[in-house]
Amino acid sequence: MSVDSFTSRLAVVMTAVVLVWWAQALPVPSPRRGESDCDAACRKFLLQYGYLDLGEENCTEVDSNRKLCSVDDELVGVPRPLARVDLAAGVSHLQTMAGLEPTGRIDASTARLFTSPRCGVPDVSKYIVAAGRRRRTRRESVIVCTTRWTTTKSNSNETLVKWWLDQSSMQWLNSTLNWVSLTNVLHHSFWKWSKESMLAFQQVSLERDAQIVVRFENGSHGDGWDFDGPGNVLAHAFQPGQSLGGDIHLDAAEPWTIYDIDGHDGNSILHVVLHEIGHALGLEHSRDPTSIMYAWYTPFKYDLGPEDVSAVAGLYGAKPASSVAAWNPKIQKFYWDRHVRNDLLPLLERDLDAEEEDSDEVR
């Protein structure tokens, strides 16, 4: 090979290397309006959770709160009303809601949102039974609806909310949880909301006396918001109102456990119920990952965050520390002794200590 030929080839190679380096150094261009790498699964997700409206030509109205839209020959239930937005804007909005950088493009973190376990309540739009305007809390993370429960206890200024657990629905459970353990999970979760607000909760023995009905459901169960089996949608709830208002539905097909200590024990029903009660009280999803109202399931989270406390207190009023109701320690001790693994007891002892301190303050 001649020197000139070698020199020419070397120049070509060096030029190619420089061009590759230059291309890699260039910033990734932002998507133009309406442009996105959003595939069918992405579009279905954006529709289902309120980030995108395909337009009336692709949808059939079911009622004033819901319509069915066709996505690649599959019908998807979509909340109404929705803003008409393009795909890139919808993806950016989703990323903002999940606490990610709003690039409008589908990266690995964004793609995981489509399959990660989460609440079935839409992130955008007025949800089903809810009526009235929405407002954000001071730090603009948790959305609070003006729809709320208004029944007041006769001997205090607390708002009394009655709840009922459908024991018969537990026959479909894919779990070892029983009625005693679940009842105590519910008592414990309602207590956490009541100690931060002027709310009082009472379990009742008849469904007709309850504002909040808690039950397990499978697949299509008559409310238009179907469950999808294990994974993805874990539960949904309806905001305060008549008929289904305030009701909490849990997917019976999920591998429910009480505490999910390592992210592999199953889905923590304590975490999910605490989240869904927030919806039943009038709160919507938060973009703050530390909030119990964050839409995606987060192991190890069993308490309200600062945003949650501010939101529920803003809706129902803050409860003075001296009037916080204490948990019944006998019921709770029995519950934990029988239904919690030994390696989870430290978490529960922390909660017990907090509740006993509240009890001492009341006395």
Curated annotation (Swiss-Prot):
One of its GO terms (molecular function) is zinc ion binding. Binds 1 zinc ion per subunit. Residues 26-126 form a propeptide. Coiled coil: none annotated. Residues 1-25 form the signal peptide. The keyword Zinc applies. The conserved cysteine present in the cysteine-switch motif binds the catalytic zinc ion, thus inhibiting the enzyme. The dissociation of the cysteine from the zinc ion upon the activation-peptide release activates the enzyme. This is Probable matrix metalloproteinase 095L.
